[in-house]
Amino acid sequence: MTFNVRLLTRHFYDAEGVLLPQEIIVYTDYVCPFCLLAEEAIVQATDDLDVEIRWRPFELRPDPVPTLKVEDPYLPLVWRDSVYPMAEKLGVPITLPNISPQPRTDKAFEVFAMAEEQGVGHPYSMAALKAFFQQERDIGDPEVLADIGESVGLERQAVLDALAEGRYREQHQAAQRHAVDEARIQSVPTLVIDGEVIQGVPDPAALKRFLIERG
């Protein structure tokens, strides 16, 4: 599939003029199936490239916006026409979770902030996406989030305590404000590569060419 690119800036160098490794910033929401598919596209595109992947939160439906319901016509239609065909093409196992209404993701992103602090933001994001779309687990449930956190090396009780105390709430809210007000994110997945914005799930081969041309 094609993807849209919005040019902002070009490469970044360190103080000595050395070109830094390319960085892919991925704005995501853990209840967006295309975000899981985008991750696989990125993996395929960057298999032999020097690229660093950084995840950033963007809640598609922050409180009080209602979340989606499985019984509404919209979700089954989108999955039938877009999600499942793309997942098959990329080789990603995925299922429409039978959880209705879909969970909010603010708590999941609070745990992401904790995971980032401990250097496991990337594996946590992948585990959260897979928990929802491959295991049909409710990622709005603190106990489920504690399980996910523990699976990537966080202390389970520390996750529960942090959620109960709202320890990372403001940090997540600040990240959400940044995504909306400064980065001007409107949809996910959105990739930012060396300052260039790519919206949607990229074709792995096209993304690889895009990275090599700017490498």
Language-model regions, residue ranges each:
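N-terminal amphipathic/basic-hydrophobic helices that include classical n-h-c signal peptides
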Residues: M1-L19
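C-terminal cap of thioredoxin/glutaredoxin-like
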Residues: E16-L19, I25, F34-V51, Y74, ...
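Solvent-exposed beta-strand sheet faces enriched in polar/charged residues
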Residues: I25-Y27, R56
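Cys/His-enriched microdomains
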Residues: Y30
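Structural alpha/beta surface segment adjacent to cysteine/selenocysteine redox centers
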Residues: L36-Q135
